Amino acid sequence: MSGIVYDAGALIGAERRASQVWALHDEALAAGVAPVVPAVVLGQAWRGGPQALLSRLLTGCVVESFDENAGRAVGRLLRDANTSDVVDAHVVLTALRYRSPVLTSDAGDLRPLVQAANSSIPIHEV
C-alpha cells in the first residue's frame, strides 16, 4: 500500500467499529504507511467528548492542514467541478498531492471533483 486519504465517512466508520475501515487502517500501519486526514475532514467528524476509537485511529495518521494556498486551490477545483463542498474538494486535492486513493462512504460526491481535476485517483467506498 502506497498511501491512503480518509474522508469523513472513513472516520465515522472507524468510530462505529466498521471492520473494513479498521482492516484497511491496520494494513496501512503494518506497511509503514501513515494514512492522511485532511484537517477539514477531522472538523467534520469530531464532536468532542472522548471519541476513543477516532482518537485511536488518528494516532497513526498525518493531519493535512488547510491554509490559504489550499483554500485557493479548493476554490478553483469547486469552480471547475461546478460544486460547492469544500471538504470533498480538499479530500481530492490531498489525495492528488499524496498520490493516494481515498477511503470514503460517498464516492458519488468525489467523482465529479476527481474528473474536474483531470485525475483518476482510486476511490474506495466503505
Give residue ranges: language-model regions.
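Acidic, PIN/NYN-like endoribonuclease modules and their adjacent C-terminal/linker elements
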Residues: 96-126
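General small-molecule cofactor/ligand-binding pocket signal
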Residues: 36, 64, 122-124
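Short beta-strand scaffold positions
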Residues: 37, 65, 86, 104-105
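Acidic catalytic patch
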Residues: 43, 61-81, 93, 107
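Acidic, metal-associated active-site segment
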Residues: 85-101
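Short, hinge-like loop/turn segments at secondary-structure boundaries
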Residues: 51-56, 81-82, 119-122
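Short, well-structured N-terminal submotif of metal-dependent ribonuclease cores
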Residues: 1-37, 43-57
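Short active-site oxyanion
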Residues: 31-35, 60-62, 96-101
